Amino acid sequence: MEKKTFYLTTPIYYPSDKLHIGHAYTTVAGDAMARYKRLRGYDVMYLTGTDEHGQKIQRKAQEKGVTPQQYVDDIVAGIQELWRKLDISYDDFIRTTQERHKKIVEKIFARLVEQGDIYLGEYEGWYCTPCESFYTERQLVDGNCPDCGRPVEKVKEESYFFRMSKYVDRLLQYYEENPDFIQPESRKNEMINNFIKPGLEDLAVSRTTFDWGIKVPGDPKHVIYVWIDALANYITALGYGTDNDEKFRKYWPADVHLVGKEIVRFHTIYWPIMLMALGLPLPKKVFGHGWLLMKDGKMSKSKGNVVDPVMIIDRYGLDALRYYLLREVPFGSDGVFTPEGFIERINYDLANDLGNLLHRTVAMIEKYFGGAIPPYRGPKTPFDRDLSETAREVVRQYEEAMERMEFSVALSAVWQLIGRTNKYIDETQPWVLAKEESKREELASVMAHLAESLRYTAVLLQPFLTRTPERIFTQLGISDRSLKEWDSLYDFGLIPEGTNVQKGEPLFPRLDIGVEVEYIKAHMQGGKPAEAAKEEKQAARAEEISIDDFAKVDLRVAEVVQPERMKNADKLLKLQLDLGGEKRQVISGIAEFYKPEELIGKKVICVANLKPAKLRGEWSEGMILAGGSGGGFSLATVDQHVPNGTKIK
């Protein structure tokens, strides 16, 4: 059976400078949608690219002493490298300087002139060079550009005009007959009230004051207005107007144009009218999302608040960034990036909720069943039943949210399942069940439910996180492709009996919030990594000791075999440790940071020759190493293959 198609586009980016995290936001969102649709079995066409013509580009190139083509070639290479680092799974990258695009734009313009939709006249009015936009006097805000707030220039020149007014009634009728065409709804009201109702004037679609652009056929002193040029990319990339237009016939009209709210006007007024004039179907939806802002407003170099996505990826990993962008901000609204919020999302959502759930599940399956996942035989208890029902309900919520492009809602649903699974461990207490042979079958059911819940989680995370789901599948021992597909979510309990788990590295190590916030802020300001802050912290150094003093400390590798809470001591945990044939009990003040069950199987470092001491009525026969500052905290651990009792030198 032939697959359904899904055509999704991002705006094509203007390569006048290095892209920041706000630009990455749109493309990551589009990538998540493209991956989701592929997961659902669609034949997806995901398009992105660059808008490389215009007066601003020409001026920037002149400032640098290079040709406009050299200027854009250099920046476009950086954009493509950024998309590679972000794992953007685009199917085509269109450049408006490519011949495949320019030839068709010339044909489109010539056709519109021939049929009388474009005519030659004279333009006198206001022009914003950064936005490449024309405005009437009444559209200006305090004399400045209504979109970016910068000063505008008064221009008077011969120009070709597009008869926008001819199509206004048809456009409003399309809005009425297709209520979901502009999303969110507030954007539609803005277009009608601010641009159409006041009277849509004919649009100047050529310039004569610069020459970096596609020339008007038969009148080369005119350059085609950059937005007419740029908007056509959505069909030129598909081969429209060529002998090889198979993709155009297959994918057009677009299912979704993803754009920032500042360019909704071009995509919901100029573009539909242009398509009407060409006799082509209109896109099904234009989604104008909000901006990713900083606390002090939009990102700008002058404010020193630009966040480089490459820096974030290199230090924290790609999935941490992708998760934050799509979880933190409701898509369609403005959102604020804060270093504190970013690090907290990593620590709480990714390291604690997800990472620890996987770690303790794998550790318990190894400990209680030799690493083999027990068979799923249906729910044994109300807790089992509730977990499996939650998983199915989360899939329903997730699907509804994704179809509405509510990415944060979809991720919230996944974390609802993760939270329910963590609670399930507390409810079933597998470490207690393991003490009674009569509870063996119930314990097996708990392990099977935990593994299956994590499999559901990994499947649902695939559109958002490009590396982590496969790491989860690997630790669960799942290699069968069918268990990673959407259709596998229709049945709970598909992991084959005896599938062997493989303990791996933590998905997301905990971070020191104070240090990492300083690091990000230093880079936002164009400074070096937060070495200065680290040096200040290290200034008050501890008293120096000799190597002989240090040699007196006996540090050994120990495995946590039985952790439990201390009665009447909120901050203390009682840990039974295996030091390689020797058992020790250690009381540790880590209860604020770790749940007992997530410590099972961890290889920690124990001070083995510390004099025993009594704490809250219990003997502590050593100390385990841990550390942190600024709100972050982590145990010192070693690789799993290091034998218990190994001396640390």
Curated annotation (Swiss-Prot):
Binds 1 zinc ion per subunit. A motif ('KMSKS' region) lies at residues 298-302. Its cofactor is Zn(2+). PROSITE patterns: AA_TRNA_LIGASE_I, TRBD. Pfam families: Anticodon_3, tRNA-synt_1g, tRNA_bind. One of its GO terms (biological process) is methionyl-tRNA aminoacylation. GO terms for cellular component: cytoplasm. Disulfide bonds: none annotated. GO terms for molecular function: ATP binding; metal ion binding; methionine-tRNA ligase activity; tRNA binding. The keyword Lipoprotein does not apply. Residues 555-647 form the tRNA-binding domain. Zn(2+) binds at C128, C131, C145, C148. A motif ('HIGH' region) lies at residues 13-23. Its EC number is 6.1.1.10. Homodimer. Belongs to the class-I aminoacyl-tRNA synthetase family. MetG type 2A subfamily. Is required not only for elongation of protein synthesis but also for the initiation of all mRNA translation through initiator tRNA(fMet) aminoacylation. NCBIfam families: metG, metG_C_term, PRK12267.1. HAMAP family: Met_tRNA_synth_type2 (MF_01228). This is Methionine--tRNA ligase.
